Structure formats: structure tokens, C-alpha cells
Amino acid sequence: MQNDAGEFVDLYVPRKCSASNRIIGAKDHASIQMNVAEVDKVTGRFNGQFKTYAICGAIRRMGESDDSILRLAKSDGIVSQNF
């Protein structure tokens, strides 16, 4: 679909689970989206950037969401590797 400026735009872009790469459906009311703020290492203040993680309801239902978020945070460098 095109807008008035002639650019191609999508009507709906589905979210994907950060842990399993599954598409999060519109009726998945158990899914969460979490923003983790990045802070300056010296001052400890918010620097205006954040990482976004989306976890689908199936992962939460299995009880694997905490491990998945920790694994994703380690890979992004938010949590130290030896935690």
C-alpha cells in the first residue's frame, strides 16, 4: 500500500518474540514487551537509549521468560557474561 507521498507502507507489522522468533498474534494477551534502559557507566544516568524485548505468551506459559530475558540481556551486553 502507498501513502500520499508515494512511499510504500505496511498496514500492520506484527511483533516477533525475541526469544523464540515466533510472531506474536493480536490475541496473545499473555505476551509482554519490556524496555530496558541503557545507562552511562560513569554517571549511572539514563542516556536516552533502550533495548526492547518482546516475550510471547507460550514462553511465559512454560516458565522460561526469566531465563530468556537473561540470555538476551547477556548477548546485548546489558548483563555481564559471568552472572
From Swiss-Prot:
Gene Ontology molecular-function annotations: structural constituent of ribosome
Covalent link (Glycyl lysine isopeptide (Lys-Gly) (interchain with G-Cter in SUMO2)) residue numbers: K41
Cell compartment(s), UniProt: Cytoplasm, Cytosol; Cytoplasm; Rough endoplasmic reticulum
A Pfam family this chain is assigned to: Ribosomal_S21e
Keyword Amino-acid biosynthesis: no
Domain of life of the native organism: Eukaryota
GO biological process: translation
Keywords associated with the record: Acetylation, Cytoplasm, Endoplasmic reticulum, Isopeptide bond, Ribonucleoprotein, Ribosomal protein, Ubl conjugation
PROSITE patterns tied to this protein: RIBOSOMAL_S21E (PS00996)
Modified residues (N-acetylmethionine): M1
Sequence similarity: Belongs to the eukaryotic ribosomal protein eS21 family.
Biological role: Component of the small ribosomal subunit. The ribosome is a large ribonucleoprotein complex responsible for the synthesis of proteins in the cell.
Quaternary state and interactors: Component of the 40S small ribosomal subunit.
Protein name: Small ribosomal subunit protein eS21
